[in-house]
From Swiss-Prot:
Alphabetized Gene3D superfamilies for the sequence: 3.40.50.450
Gene that specifies this protein: dnph1
Role description: Part of a nucleotide salvage pathway that eliminates epigenetically modified 5-hydroxymethyl-dCMP (hmdCMP) in a two-step process entailing deamination to cytotoxic 5-hydroxymethyl-dUMP (hmdUMP), followed by its hydrolysis into 5-hydroxymethyluracil (hmU) and 2-deoxy-D-ribose 5-phosphate (deoxyribosephosphate). Catalyzes the second step in that pathway, the hydrolysis of the N-glycosidic bond in hmdUMP, degrading this cytotoxic nucleotide to avoid its genomic integration.
InterPro entries: 2'-dNMP_N-hydrolase, DNPH1, Nucleoside_deoxyribTrfase
Name by which UniProt lists this protein: 5-hydroxymethyl-dUMP N-hydrolase
Catalysed reaction, written as an equation: 5-hydroxymethyl-dUMP + H2O = 5-hydroxymethyluracil + 2-deoxy-D-ribose 5-phosphate
Taxonomic superkingdom: Eukaryota
GO cellular component terms listed in the entry, alphabetical order: cytoplasm; nucleus
Assembly mode: Monomer and homodimer.
Residues given in the record as 5-hydroxymethyl-dUMP binding sites: G7, I9, R10, G11, S78, G80, E84, S108
Lineage of the species this protein comes from: Eukaryota, Metazoa, Chordata, Craniata, Vertebrata
Protein's organism: Tetraodon nigroviridis (Spotted green pufferfish)
Chief localisation class: cytoplasm
EC number: 3.2.2.-
Amino acid sequence: MKVYFCGSIRGGRDDAELYHRMVAKLQSFATVLTEHVGRRELGDTGEHVTQGDRFIHDRDVDWLRQSDVVVAEVTQPSLGVGYELGRAVDMKKKVLCLFRPSSGRRLSAMIRGADNGDSFVVRDYCQDEIEQVLEDFFSNQK
């Protein structure tokens, strides 16, 4: 199984440590195509690739096409994550969006309203339960 993990990069890296934990857990279930999102040292300027933004876009869309499941941490608002989710829906990918209400933020209605309980799932969670949330989700994906 291949997982495309979405998390904010240029929109802010406040959750970088959490992304690291999530990617580590996801790797116990599947190949994570976007493991770089979980790198603690990745700053909000993004990756330093000489090929530029077009290269990043095309590479990531290719990874999205290859993926079986998309897991997105959506607490930190990010235009890129929203774009990835829209593309994932268009590609008919199974999507799990994870949101922490304790952040004080409100999740966009375009994300929460897309939850259909099947191919697009939005789950509220607390940081200390993230590993269990992922285990529960992936135990139903086999």
